[in-house]
Amino acid sequence: MSNAPITHIDLTSFLADPYPALAHMRANAPITYVPELDATLFTRRDDIHRHEKRIEVFSSIQQDGLMTQLMGQNMMRKDGEEHMAERRALFPALSPRTVKDHWKPIFEATAIDLLQTLAPKGKCDLVRDFAMPVSAAALRAITGLESMSNLEMDTVSQAMIDGCSNFEGKKKVTKRSKKATRLICDHIKFARENSPQQSALKVMDDAGLSDESLNANIKLIISGGQNEPRDAIAGTIWALINHPSQLQLIRSGQATWLDAFNEYARWMAPIGMSPRVIVKEDTIDRITLHPEDRVFFMFGSAGRDETYFSAPDTFDISRITQPAISFGAGQHFCAGAAAARCR
């Protein structure tokens, strides 16, 4: 383990609301070893932004990690040229131009149809009736797995996210997550012969990715491409409803819906944490990290760094959010960021 200052946390409280503990770490020990997580946490924006790029020290390759065990080794668990080759293969499906010209009209049509269906009812469950299906429909289109239902897409995404964070080794969670990955593989086999031209499945297949890499990366896209937009859509709407002065800024033309999304993503980062493994001894601010040490880059904490954001716990869509690294930094910047902002 590193010789970083030690900070203890209550896991139950941390899982429910990590932000008070993260604020304490930023103020008192911005790089700190947390025994309950068996990891050294980086909590300040600049430290994360700087060192996340140093893949020669902070490696994403984790052969025994929960994500790799569950999905296979996807691009998120690769570095350097191996990562970039798969990222380039996926890029035609998720480039800003493709999102603007191809996906945006599809997303908008889906949202309008759903709103028109819900309007006569007078009320709805924001997550179940709107955020979940609108996000799932978009993801079915992007992946090319149109044979999946919206509910199936949501279920398998959540099951994989639960599996990737199943550090306690709960058998029911493991069983559910493995069932989800098998279902995804079945749908990939079904869709592969006639996958839509712009879909992730089609462009990666055309680029010659192996079956193993293609399957692993489709699972990766699903794991983050459903639950994160679903929660961001519902969360942004919830935040605006509960902060009427912020909603009024949009209605009066003083702010945009994108401003609201960017602020919500800063406030409740879609990527709360990204793990790394130390592969070469390194010293930072007199803290020595040793090979095999685990490091967690806490992107959720970076979005509330007081150095860049005044009153960081406050939802304020008028603030400048450019310094936020809500979608990561460097080589592992979220490949679906343009699609997420569009949704």
Task: Walk through the language-model features, giving the residues of each.
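Cytochrome P450
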Residues: M1-R343
